[in-house]
Amino acid sequence: MPHTLLILNGKESGNPEVREAVKNVRDEGLTLHVRITWEHGDAKRYVEEAATLAVSTVIAGGGDGTINEVATALMSLPADKRPCLGILPLGTANDFATGCNIPLQIENALQLAVKGRAVAIDLAQVNGEHYFINMATGGFGTRITTETPDKLKAALGGVSYFIHGLMRLDALKADSCKIHGPDFHWSGDALVIGIGNGKQAGGGQLLCPDALINDGLMQLRLLTAKELLPAVLSTLFNGEKNKNVIDATVPWLDITAPNDITFNLDGEPLSGRHFHIEILPHAIQCRLPPNCPLLG
């Protein structure tokens, strides 16, 4: 069997369930290398090391940010030398893993990441050098995911983002910008911007419910009203029609703004005044369950 490399977020290095799951894989006679990340850049170094270890699968063990870092590192390799991506969800929200129906039980998830079916999936590229596998969010949602206290996330998981958002409703502020893509043009003040390769963000909120990870497209969703709560937020996440929610499905987008705005790319912040975002079809292989709802 080909070798597998698990890149594990340092916060989970002492997790006894992870240790037991790794032991069980090795007891089957499979080769599973483990590397621990402690700072930004470690994942890229370990992905580069994968080539010398004859690794066919690199597993991202952590949350959405860890998955992003590993997927981004894979894109730095030549296409014919890229290992397959596996996912061991260990974060607060685990939005991409949950959206894919990847088991949240550590033993089951690791077995899938090692042995599961490899499927070609899309990645989104931002300004030619940054990537996201799940979603880019801007506006109020970005500020909430960035500012939610770690202790609240640890105690409540994904619902912590929603609770912290309710606490910060007095700080609502829209971002002025222009957005255009194929047959789509919009300008105005956006309170929430969601650009989805995957469907959900912020701990399970279906921000881009029509998105798929293998269709060569991304879903744009804008919330433009300020007189929203709670009705318009309910509309945004429950799929009801509302004049303040704008949808588009496109292969690329250009976003320009008079002032700096910040997007979270799978939780990783990127600020600027111009963003070119495009889908790279079938960019990487990912081990996914047969019932993955993000596949078309």
From Swiss-Prot:
Highest taxon above the source species: Bacteria
Cofactor(s) listed: Mg(2+); Ca(2+)
Gene Ontology biological-process entries: phospholipid biosynthetic process
Residues covered by the DAGKc domain: 1-130
Binding site for Mg(2+): 212, 215, 217
PROSITE patterns noted in UniProt: DAGK (PS50146)
Keyword annotations: ATP-binding, Cytoplasm, Kinase, Lipid biosynthesis, Lipid metabolism, Magnesium, Metal-binding, Nucleotide-binding, Phospholipid biosynthesis, Phospholipid metabolism, Transferase
SMART domains in the record: DAGKc
Active site: 268 (proton acceptor)
EC number: 2.7.1.-
Pfam family, one: YegS_C
HAMAP family reported in the protein's UniProt record: YegS
NCBIfam families noted in UniProt: lip_kinase_YegS, PRK13054.1, YegS/Rv2252/BmrU family lipid kinase
Name listed for the protein in its UniProt record: Probable lipid kinase YegS-like
